[in-house]
Amino acid sequence: MAGLKQHSGLVVPLDAANVDTDAIIPKQFLQAITRVGFGKHLFHEWRYLDAEETRPNPEFVLNFPQYQGATILLARKNLGCGSSREHAPWALADYGFKVMIAPSFADIFYNNSLNNHMLPIKLSEQEVDEIFHWVWANPGKQIHVDLEAKTVTVGDKVYHFELDEFRRHCLLEGLDNIGLTLQHEDAIAAYEKKIPAFLR
């Protein structure tokens, strides 16, 4: 899996707090257990005017022409609250988001996002508000995220964020739980050789 070292992308300014996982991906779309195919249902209730998803809501920000192809989601506090369903980050990732920026995230959603190789960045409410105003004033312009330096560059301003070093290492190297285990493959093989045959 490719690592996430630096990323430049368009930002969708979702000007809402307490966006829960039911809003991100409604329960009627949770039958599948694979990670693909959820992107088209992302924010279903807000994004479409009909249940069949044939009539996009022109007033929902994800449908605005200037934000098509966006890979960074900007939101207010407590993003991903509600149930612990992992389908929420699956839907965001399948849509194409790689980075999320908010003042705070629900704990389980935050961890699930990292496990699915998306970067949730916590900045202060004032900093997030500044970025909202910049995005509104600069449609079509990208911002730059540098995970190695732990910075977000918006126009001529640089914001610094914190991330647990273990989580940062996993994102930089593109490692999931299996990948982490395989980093110790030689040590595991050496240990297995020491185990008596009848215990193998």
UniProtKB/Swiss-Prot annotation:
Disulfide bonds listed in the record: none
SUPFAM superfamilies, A to Z:
LeuD/IlvD-like (SSF52016)
Does Electron transport show up as a keyword for this record? no
Q: Pathway, according to UniProt?
A: Amino-acid biosynthesis; L-leucine biosynthesis; L-leucine from 3-methyl-2-oxobutanoate: step 2/4
Please indicate which superkingdom the organism of origin belongs to: Bacteria
Q: Which UniProt keyword terms apply here?
A: Amino-acid biosynthesis, Branched-chain amino acid biosynthesis, Leucine biosynthesis, Lyase
Q: Which NCBIfam families match?
A: leuD, PRK01641.1
Give a short account of what the protein does. Catalyzes the isomerization between 2-isopropylmalate and 3-isopropylmalate, via the formation of 2-isopropylmaleate.
Protein's name in the database? 3-isopropylmalate dehydratase small subunit
